[in-house]
């Protein structure tokens, strides 16, 4: 289990195997290489700098496999937020965990 933060520095949750989870236990996505896809197969972002989540604006129309999300897990107290990084051109911050509904 590896904790991850948005590019802006907000604690998002963790990666367990090929799955992305919010800190409050929602299964958000599957990881294909470094790209993250939601349960409908839509690109939602990628992993950069080992533990940061960011979204490439040019990839928002990309699709991969769909999947059935796992049930909710136990919630964790979120890790401390970090200072955000400067945004790269053509990217935007990964959505916060609260924006994903189950």
Regions found by a protein language model. Name each.
Residues 5-7, 23, 64:
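Intrinsic disorder/low-complexity segments enriched in polar/charged and small flexible residues
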Residues 1-2, 42-102:
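Long terminal segments
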Residues 1-14:
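Short, compositionally biased leader-like segments
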Residues 3-4, 19-21, 36-37, 53:
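Well-ordered beta-strand segments characteristic of repetitive beta-sheet solenoids
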